[in-house]
Every structure is written in structure tokens, then in C-alpha cells.
Amino acid sequence: MTGKPAYKRVLLKASGEALMGSQGFGIDVSVADRIANDIKQARALGVEVGVVIGGGNIFRGVAVASKGGDRVTGDHMGMLATVINSLALRTSLHKIGVDSVVLSAIAMPEICESFSQRQATAYMDEGKVVIFAGGTGNPFFTTDSAAALRAAEIEADALLKGTQVDGIYSADPKKDPGATRFDQLTHKEFLDRGLAVMDTAAVALARENNIPIIVYSIHENGGLADILQGKGRCTIVSDN
């Protein structure tokens, strides 16, 4: 890997579902290990990496609300699921010698450190991979919004969203064979089209802070390093 990376510091958003692999629930350790290896390759390029992982492989707060339950409690349960996933990724990173730390938006000092912007940037300056757990710490906000928020706080050069497909499509390509993939969109075009790959609050926050969003397939081995070097299939959401 000799290509010069296009970004110095990035925030990687991975869905909880990505950690399931072919399982119907929970964490496939082999998938966590592969994502960790992708992050190691990014670090080898000299790129500083922050990570936000969703919790949908374990629990979704909206599922509680849809069945008449309390959305706030459901979202708190979902935040705890992101902590579990974050600890799993940290374990996978440590196995391959990548120094990493979990910072949680919800205080749980016996398990991981609490989030602060200053500490997060200090760790990244030291070369550590920082995994942000607990979402934003508030209900009614998705982990997409948490990713955009943390990207702004650490002054990331880009927000990378690893998904099930290789970019943003006009429709779900798994359901519509005629769906077309976009190479590039502006933040406004994304919002105007009502595309569902990332929630509007996250995209609006990225736009306000001039953070490009890059959507790519998280299932490609070495895909993260390729994207960082300007290679690979993806969609770039940027106003520049």
C-alpha cells in the first residue's frame, strides 16, 4: 500500500448489521476481525481513524416504539448495544496489534472511558483508533447522526459509511435491478432526493461542517484502504 491517502483523519461509520455476517443476530467474530484488518491497513497509510458502530445486530430502539413501548427506553437499550459492538471491535483490533480505545457517550467507567472531545482528539493525535460508543448519548438520534457529530468534533476530513452495497443508488439495488448508482452527489441533492442510506439529520450536519460523505461496501476486503487512496467503487457526497 504505497498510494498517498486523500484524507488525514476520517470517521468510519459501520452498521451493526454488518457485524452479523451471515448470522441472523449478534456478532460474527470473523467479520469484526476483517473490519479490524481494514482499519489496520488504513492506519498503515498514516490515516487517523475514528469509528462509530450501530447496534442493529443486537437491538433497535424503534422496534420497541413500533410495538407500543417507550421509545426513550428502547433507544437507551440500543445505545448499550453499540457499546457491546464497540468492545468487540476493540478486541479484534487489539488481537492484531492496533492500539484502540472505546469512548462512550454514556458513563460506564468499569467498562470503557467516557467521551470528551479533547480526549478523543488527543488519542487520535497519538495514533490510537478511537471507537465512539453510546450514540450521541441522547434518545431519538441515530448512530448516523452520532457519526456526523463525532466527525465534526474531531474535525475529520471525511465521513465514510460502510454499507451492504458499493455506493448510493436511486433505489434499493437488491430489490430493483434497474437502480442506478451515483458517482457523486451534493449534500443538497442527497437531501432533495430523499435517499435512505443515511438519515437527513446526519447529512445536514455534515453539510453544515463541510464534511464529505463517502458511501462504499464494507464487505470488500481492503475496501477501506482503496477508498482512502481514491480507488474502489463508492459514492461521494460533497459540495466541493
From Swiss-Prot:
A biological-process GO annotation: UDP biosynthetic process
InterPro entries (UniProt xref): AceGlu_kinase-like_sf (IPR036393), Asp/Glu/Uridylate_kinase (IPR001048), Uridylate_kinase (IPR011817), Uridylate_kinase_bac (IPR015963)
Enzyme class, UniProt record, top EC level: transferase
Region (Involved in allosteric activation by GTP): 21-26
Keyword hit for Amino-acid biosynthesis: no
Residues given in the record as ATP binding sites: 13-16, 56, 60, 163-164, 169, 172
Keyword terms of this UniProt record: Allosteric enzyme, ATP-binding, Cytoplasm, Kinase, Nucleotide-binding, Pyrimidine biosynthesis, Transferase
Primary residence: cytoplasm
Catalytic activity: UMP + ATP = UDP + ADP
Pathway field: Pyrimidine metabolism; CTP biosynthesis via de novo pathway; UDP from UMP (UMPK route): step 1/1
Annotated positions binding UMP: 55, 75, 136-143
GO CC terms of this entry: cytosol
EC number of this enzyme: 2.7.4.22
Location of the protein in the cell: Cytoplasm
Activity modulation: Allosterically activated by GTP. Inhibited by UTP.
GO molecular function, one term: UMP kinase activity
Entries under HAMAP family matching the protein: PyrH_B
Role description: Catalyzes the reversible phosphorylation of UMP to UDP.
Family recorded in the similarity comment: Belongs to the UMP kinase family.
Oligomer and partners: Homohexamer.
Protein's recorded name: Uridylate kinase
Source species of the chain: Brucella suis biovar 1 (strain 1330)
Gene: pyrH
